[in-house]
Amino acid sequence: MDSIDLIGIVYFCSMRYRHYPLVILMAIAFQSNAQDKWDLRRCVDYALVNNISIKQTDIQARLAKIQLYQSQLSQYPGASFSTGTSYNSGRNQDPTSFSLITESYLSANMQLQTSAQIFNWYSKRNTIAANQWEFQAAMAASEKVRNDIALNIANVYLLVLLSKEQEKIAGIQLQQSQSQLGNTRKLVNAGSLPELNAAELEAQVARDSATFIMSKGTTAQNVLSLKAFMALDAATPFELDIPPVDKIPVEDIADLQPDAVYASAIANLPQQRVNDYKIKAAERNLAATKANMYPTLSAFGSLGTGYNSRANEILSATPLNAPLGKVTVGGTLYDVYPLRPFTDYTYGKQHLFSQLNQNFRQSIGLSLSVPIFNSGSLRTAYERSKLNIQNLQYQQQADNQKTKQDIYQAYNSAMVALEKFNAGKKSLETADRSYGFAQKRYNVGMLTTLELVTNQNNLFSAKLENALNQYDYVFKMKVLEFYKGKGIKL
């Protein structure tokens, strides 16, 4: 019922009878009860959110997406920073002056490195394309699992509806037997019928009670199976919205010819896309493994600097031009000076940033990597990639054959189910008429109790068989509609 209609009814009742609070509570209770029922759409939607298998396939799709993202990032240059510090004593090489010393000192080094592949025969590009197809395959696989879960839920849902219908038929049968036993017991007590008639009906009531209890157990078991597919807690209250089976829309079987359904399935079913995407991914992986067998050209560069605790720097310099001595020439005394003046230096500890600036170094270059011999690992990877493509192609053929076989089997099963359903309806009509005649004859004493029970059992069996045939036909048709790409609708 629409919310607008419900509000209108509430308003009308409140104005007509002036019991506004009571009407509101009744309306809320009615709406809540309607919402608590589970139809097929609600069951499927709940399963798509909570089913463990679906969650696992979603994780696989997310892992494939992460792998794709990582391969895309591999196109860009890599960079790393490293640093270290050490305390040295004894005879060591000064890392800044590269001279041998015997003093103890503290040193530190820092380096930034980067590298990038310039050309690798499109190995990375093919790897990215392969991961892209793998991601698409994972998404299609997730969709396939969702479709399989929906189909399984529809199957179990129909089984629950069938078991409930059989339970209803068994309950009616039990009520009829109990009513007949009550009437017969009155006639026996009045002396109109022998005790044997009542005993036979008591046995029939016992059999009908057992059948009714078994049908209730079957319904409960099917409900538990449905909850399991939905990942719904077994203790959760659960009431199905039961549509009349004759109101379930079913496409005309003439529009579900197996050849046309198979062509539609190949074009639309996610399993076919999974196979297509995996083959394309394998072809790209083959190209990537082949590229790894050729030389790779790369560029690299680095920046670095260092620090040494014993490094000194000149704080000041004083030129010295003092005479070295005296000399007498021709009786004259002269001062002797050096050809070059001396300089007196004052040293002190070199500061950190001064050292980092002074020791700053750079490098850049190219490298060529040529695979010559690697124990056949690259060739093995290449051959395995080729065989993997063939294996996936065979898997695709096998899946296509199985899909075609399943469709033809479903079509033949639907045809048989339709014929059984039509024949069952005639059998039910005949059994119903026979039971009606038997009741009339029994009421006037022209039929024994055993004969009446036999006719009643025949009618009961015909009802059960008709319900089974009807639900079986509906499910077979829903399978064909599923393969055609119509989804599951009840």
Regions found by a protein language model. Give the residues of each.
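Membrane-embedded beta-strand positions in outer-membrane beta-barrel channels/transporters
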Residues: Q111-Q113, Y157, Y262, G365-S367, ...
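Outer-membrane beta-barrel architecture
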Residues: Y69, Q113, N285-A288, S367
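Bacterial Sec-dependent N-terminal signal peptides
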Residues: M1-L40, L48-N51, I488-L490
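Small/polar, glycine/serine/threonine/aspartate-rich low-complexity segments that form flexible
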Residues: S82-A116, P244-I253, F300-V370
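Periplasmic alpha-helical coiled-coil/stalk elements that build and connect Gram-negative outer-membrane
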Residues: D148-S264, S413, A417, N458-L459, ...
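Bacterial Sec-pathway N-terminal export signals of envelope proteins
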Residues: N33-G84, G90, A234, D241-N285, ...
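Sec/SRP-type N-terminal targeting helices
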Residues: K55-I59, Q72-L73, S104, I118-R146, ...
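Short segments within alpha-helical structural elements
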Residues: I59, L73, A210-L232, K425-K486
